[in-house]
């Protein structure tokens, strides 16, 4: 198993404190990995800074060829990546193979093509005898911090646009789920010039702070919690670094009386519980109009209770464990707080399961009120709440009454209503009669405390560039 760091094109052992990496399906230790030392973090950043002088000037074609080679290599090693991700995260193996790996490969291939389409504009003559042009240039060294819910996919979302734009990257995966990023490092070593891509391992307080605070780091890209985002913003503010933040969500799912309730129930069964609900866009905050509320609660209860939990390698498993014991305790505490409210009905689930591993039963909580914590705070687990509403204005007000602003969905047969709401919902994405669907060509990112900046799409590529004005006197 690959456990070494990638620094300046060389795989090396970490020199810091050893950390245990767990299998959440069993609670057992997979292996121990040594963190990067402060000296190694410095070496990785300096290597990236040195490599930028040449990599930043390479042609888009050359950068695209490297990204395509990496995509091909991931595809050729798909089963090994899937097994590592499943073992380290508890994800059902078939979900990683069929859903995640193809999407990861596609992200690298999309940005390989996008790199060759990004261009500045010839702006024209705005001053007599002078011609202005616009350039989009790479920024420099980018520090990327990836989360533990989709370790390899989020690494791809960060690496592909940054490298395509001509930046050099030092990435730190979560210390909870580092295995696929370290495997990726071994493949990238023989594809990219030394220093262009560096992969570290370690905790935020020992490695992340040293990395993001380094004077040579020009940009920090984070996918993580609001608390982590606030910390990084405070930590990097004195140096005025560019930041790119994706900080979670609490997606409202608005279901009107005219919606197809069977489609809603099956949709929430998938979109609310995929990856054990550990998804920033999970369909977790349902608002159902009064006329169909009881019927939807019944249909959802039947749908959610039919989800099969089990071992990740079992092909029939739909729901794996949570990522860590600490997170299991957080989810349990959130549900217990909700259950203590007299008006909450537990339709199904509501507790962790017996036996080994960090499993929590798929849970549906009915009759939640707008002010309840279960409605207002991200749980990030297999937990969905449902709240009754009366009219369009009320549900719009409630949906927007959130510090989050990442994703939302509206379920209705009324096209006019769908357009009205999608124009007024304060979320980076609104789906109509579906949820959770993402493609490489379209941007993903939030507003409010869900952060700013876009992943995927040409907008994501532009986020990793600087806009510069060039004026020529003639």
From Swiss-Prot:
Q: Does the keyword NAD apply?
A: yes
BP GO terms, sorted: L-lysine catabolic process; putrescine catabolic process
- Top-level EC class, please? oxidoreductase
Q: Known catalysed reaction(s)?
A: 4-aminobutanal + NAD(+) + H2O = 4-aminobutanoate + NADH + 2 H(+); 5-aminopentanal + NAD(+) + H2O = 5-aminopentanoate + NADH + 2 H(+)
What EC number is given for this enzyme?
1.2.1.19, 1.2.1.-
The entry's keywords: NAD, Oxidoreductase
Q: Which residues bind NAD(+)?
A: 146-148, 172-175, 209, 225-228, 280
Identify the domain of life. Bacteria
Enumerate the Pfam families for this protein. Answer: Aldedh (PF00171)
Listed pathway(s)? Amine and polyamine degradation; putrescine degradation; 4-aminobutanoate from 4-aminobutanal: step 1/1; Amino-acid degradation
- Which GO MF terms are attached to this record? aminobutyraldehyde dehydrogenase (NAD+) activity; NAD binding
| Cell inner membrane recorded as keyword | no
* Disulfide bridge partners, by residue number: none
Write out the catalytic residues in the record: 246, 280
Give the family from UniProt.
Answer: Belongs to the aldehyde dehydrogenase family. Gamma-aminobutyraldehyde dehydrogenase subfamily.
* Subunit comment: Homotetramer.
Query: Which miscellaneous remark does the UniProt record hold?
Result: 4-aminobutanal can spontaneously cyclize to 1-pyrroline, and 5-aminopentanal to 1-piperideine.
* NCBIfam families (alphabetical): ABALDH (TIGR03374), PRK13473.1 (NF010000)
* Protein role: Catalyzes the oxidation 4-aminobutanal (gamma-aminobutyraldehyde) to 4-aminobutanoate (gamma-aminobutyrate or GABA). This is the second step in one of two pathways for putrescine degradation, where putrescine is converted into 4-aminobutanoate via 4-aminobutanal. Also functions as a 5-aminopentanal dehydrogenase in a a L-lysine degradation pathway to succinate that proceeds via cadaverine, glutarate and L-2-hydroxyglutarate.
Task: Quote the HAMAP family the UniProt record gives.
Answer: Aldedh_Prr (MF_01275)
Protein name listed in UniProt = Gamma-aminobutyraldehyde dehydrogenase
> What broad taxonomic lineage does this protein's source fall under?
Bacteria, Pseudomonadati, Pseudomonadota, Gammaproteobacteria, Enterobacterales
């Amino acid at each position: 198993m690959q456990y070494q760091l990638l620094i300046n094109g060389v795989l090396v052992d970490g020199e810091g404190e050893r950390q245990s990496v767990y299998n959440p399906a069993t609670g057992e230790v997979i292996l121990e990995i040594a963190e990067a030392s402060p000296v190694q973090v410095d070496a990785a950043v300096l290597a990236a800074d040195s490599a930028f002088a040449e990599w930043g000037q390479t042609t888009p074609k050359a950068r695209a060829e490297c990204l395509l080679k990496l995509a091909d290599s991931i595809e050729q090693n798909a089963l090994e990546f899937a097994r590592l991700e499943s073992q380290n995260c508890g994800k059902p193996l078939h979900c990683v193979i069929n859903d995640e790996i193809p999407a990861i490969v596609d992200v690298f291939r999309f940005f390989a093509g996008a790199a060759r389409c990004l261009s500045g504009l010839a702006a024209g003559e705005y001053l007599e005898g002078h011609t202005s042009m616009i350039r989009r240039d790479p920024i420099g060294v980018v520090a990327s911090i990836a989360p533990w819910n989709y370790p390899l996919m989020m690494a791809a979302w960060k690496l592909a646009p940054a490298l395509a734009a001509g930046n050099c990257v030092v990435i730190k995966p979560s210390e909870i789920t580092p295995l696929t990023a370290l495997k990726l490092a071994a493949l990238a070593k023989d594809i990219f010039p030394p220093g262009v891509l560096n992969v570290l391992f370690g905790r935020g307080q020992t490695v992340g702070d040293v990395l993001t605070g380094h004077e040579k780091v020009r940009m920090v890209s984070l996918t993580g919690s609001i608390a982590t985002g606030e910390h990084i913003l405070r930590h990097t503010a004195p140096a005025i670094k560019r930041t790119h933040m994706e900080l979670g969500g609490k997606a409202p799912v608005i279901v009107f009386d005219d919606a197809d309730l069977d489609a809603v129930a099956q949709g929430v069964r998938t979109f609310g519980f995929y990856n054990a609900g550990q998804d920033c866009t999970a369909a977790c905050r349902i608002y159902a109009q009064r006329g169909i509320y009881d019927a939807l609660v019944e249909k959802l209860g039947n749908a959610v209770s039919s989800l099969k939990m089990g071992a990740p390698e079992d092909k029939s498993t739909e729901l794996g464990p949570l990522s860590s014991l600490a997170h299991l305790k957080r989810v349990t505490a959130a549900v217990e707080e909700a259950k203590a409210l007299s008006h909450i009905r537990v339709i199904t689930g509501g507790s962790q399961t017996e036996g080994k591993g960090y499993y929590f039963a798929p849970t549906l909580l009915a009759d939640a009120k707008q002010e309840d914590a279960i409605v207002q705070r991200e749980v990030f687990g297999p937990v969905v709440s449902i709240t009754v509403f009366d009219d369009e204005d009320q549900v719009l007000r409630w949906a927007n009454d959130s510090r989050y602003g990442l994703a939302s969905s509206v379920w209705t047969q009324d096209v006019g209503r769908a357009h009205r709401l999608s124009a007024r919902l304060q979320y980076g994405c609104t789906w109509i009669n579906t949820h959770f669907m993402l493609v490489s060509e379209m941007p993903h990112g939030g507003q409010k405390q869900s952060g700013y900046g876009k992943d995927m799409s040409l907008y994501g590529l532009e986020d990793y560039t600087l806009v510069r004005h060039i004026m020529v006197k003639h």
